[in-house]
């Protein structure tokens, strides 16, 4: 059985393993299953998640619903942070801010990127002296025609599991 790191690693280059990873994520986060989010692309420092243009993701004028855009933004940043941070840290959503630029009328793609330098500067170094930190993560979502649909700022609280008082 593959562990989380192995599954993410294989999903970088294999559509079969991306499909398996998406199935696992549907089970881990059942709230997202009806939206049919799919990890479209993943590499060492970024992830792109597809928000399909399907009826359950529509608003009242058959555009992509604002809440679906917010949820795919949270999902993409959370998935990459979990992959990069591993099991040592707990992440929990503190705040989510959305700015909507254009009405989505096709599949949308939310992309989040962080590199090791960003993690060192914004997560690991601050956690050496703080019990918990809050990091802002910027997620941009584009439609199939490359129109900028939304920009999300997701603030994640990060804390070492050994400092958490209420266990999962």
Give each language-model segment a name:
Residues 33-39, 94-99, 122-124:
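Short structured motifs
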Residues 46-48, 64, 156:
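Soluble, non-transmembrane catalytic domains of enzymes that act on hydrophobic metabolites at membranes
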């Amino acid at each position: 059985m593959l562990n989380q790191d192995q599954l993410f690693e294989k999903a970088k280059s294999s559509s079969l393993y991306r499909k398996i990873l998406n199935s696992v994520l549907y089970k881990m986060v059942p709230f997202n299953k009806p939206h049919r989010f799919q990890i479209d692309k993943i590499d060492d420092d970024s992830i792109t998640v597809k928000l399909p243009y399907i009826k359950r993701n529509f608003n009242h004028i058959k555009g992509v619903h604002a809440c679906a855009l917010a949820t795919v933004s949270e999902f993409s940043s959370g998935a990459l942070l979990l992959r990069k941070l591993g099991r040592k840290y707990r992440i929990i959503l503190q705040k989510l801010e959305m700015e909507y630029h254009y009405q989505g009328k096709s599949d949308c793609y939310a992309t989040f990127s962080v590199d090791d330098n960003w993690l060192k500067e914004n997560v690991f170094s601050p956690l050496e002296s703080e019990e918990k930190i809050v990091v802002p993560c910027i997620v941009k979502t584009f439609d199939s025609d490359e129109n900028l649909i939304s920009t999300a700022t997701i603030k994640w609280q990060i804390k070492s599991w050994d400092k958490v008082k209420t266990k999962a």
